[in-house]
Design a protein with these regions (language model features):
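Kelch-like beta-propeller repeat domains
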Residues: 18-328
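Gram-negative bacterial Sec-dependent N-terminal signal peptides
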Residues: 1-18
Length: 328
């Protein structure tokens, strides 16, 4: 059994399976990525820098083991997936050779047998940050995420502004004061075939792209839960991708974390029920946006949800709370 997860779902999966039996991560872990191959969990990047670790959840002596360092430099918001015994890492946010923050669209492959990395000669047709990745029928699928040109341009402007607070305020106002559709978040579904290292168009959402959604995949169905609709504005939407019969259908389920929604939440499956927990957002931002304020989160404080929601029998129910609000 191969599963695709993000760093966000590792905590949720551990929570559902009784997290007390697993050792703490080797370093405080945030904004990284991870994947499960059979019973072994792999995590890396984010606050771990270029480090990667693995944990055999069935071992008698459960402990994290350090792996070869990632060759592409420290990155946040990369995603990863196991396919045919190899780990693939997609995109992320990091520093380029000039020291500027940018979105990457590259792919790296890790071979557990040789404990080695290789950068593939393959680039997605768009940047990959805030995106989600899942596996279906031997291919990796990617959707969502920020627009590479807009995001990179924002950080180029901030770099040029230096410590000029007036210029920075002007840049932020210009960046955040737009409608959601003007950020061009990715609503395309892309497929990556590891046998050819080629990217292909696989469809697109009939609604809109999100960034920082939680993703859950089981069989022919994948769920995208909440996320950003634009910088600072979340959505409470839940999308379902159904591959049944090799005919991709997009469905919209009942919302959760209403009315403002969250980004960077945790999600997983337990006893055939979909679980969604945590996430961060700005209370009041949705109302501001609906009232015509594009810079919807201006002046609002980011809050972290502790709520645990369960999707069962066609509806969401609050089933408990995390020990504290958390996200990413």
């Amino acid at each position: 059994m191969n599963k695709t997860i993000t760093a966000l779902t590792i905590i949720m999966a551990s929570f559902a399976a009784n997290a007390s039996v697993l050792p703490e991560t080797p370093v405080p872990f945030k904004s990284g990525t991870g994947a499960i191959d059979n019973d072994t969990v792999y995590i890396g990047l984010g606050s771990a820098g270029t480090a990667w670790y693995k944990l055999d959840t069935q071992a008698k002596d459960k402990k994290w083991t350090a792996l070869a360092a990632f060759p592409g430099g420290p990155r946040d918001q990369a995603t990863s997936a196991f396919i045919d015994g190899n780990l693939y890492v997609f995109g992320g946010i990091g520093k380029n050779s000039e020291g500027l923050t940018q979105v990457f669209n590259d792919v790296h492959k890790y071979n557990p047998k040789t404990n080695s990395w290789v950068k593939l000669i393959s680039h997605a047709p768009m940047g990959m940050a805030g995106h989600v990745t899942f596996v279906h029928n031997g291919k990796a699928y990617v959707t969502g995420g920020v627009n590479q040109n807009i995001f990179n341009g924002y950080f180029e402007d901030l770099n040029e502004a230096g410590k000029d607070s007036t210029a920075i305020d002007k840049i932020n106002a210009h960046y955040f004061d737009k409608k959601a559709e003007d950020y061009f978040f990715n609503k395309f579904l892309l497929s990556f075939d590891p046998s050819t290292q080629q990217w292909s168009y696989a469809g697109e959402s009939p609604w809109y792209g999100t960034a920082g959604a939680a993703v859950v995949n089981k069989g022919d169905k994948t769920w995208l839960i909440n996320g950003e609709a634009k910088p600072g504005l979340r959505t409470d939407a839940v999308f379902e991708l159904d591959f049944t019969g090799n005919n991709l259908k997009w469905n919209k389920l009942a919302p959760v974390s209403s009315p403002d929604g969250v980004a960077g939440g945790f999600a997983g499956i337990s006893n055939d029920s979909l679980i969604f927990a945590g996430g961060a957002g700005f209370k009041g931002s949705r109302e501001n946006y609906q009232n015509g304020k594009n810079y919807a989160h201006e002046g609002l404080k980011k809050s972290y949800s502790a709520d645990i929601h369960l999707w069962h029998n066609g509806k969401w129910d609050k089933s408990g709370e995390l020990s504290q609000g958390r996200a990413y």
